[in-house]
């Protein structure tokens, strides 16, 4: 049962691996690279197979952006002026919530 309309007002999209994760509210889904097949149907952002480590954090919904680091294998979630990171499996917080600029996220932005 779908609860979000993924045809408009998307929060953010992340291209990683074999497809695109699309986020809206507290839900996400994954399509293949062509965008014509669902690889993961709509689930909670905090569901197993997504990012369960975000449960209980303010990053469990309404995200501004997400970045994947090829270097560390971490997923960085951004919301407002803060960020948090999970491991590649999404089941462990590897960098606790901090300010994006100057707080350990991207210190070079604090100018």
Enumerate the language-model features and the residues they cover.
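Disulfide-stabilized extracellular ectodomains of secreted/luminal proteins, especially beta-rich
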Residues: 1-111
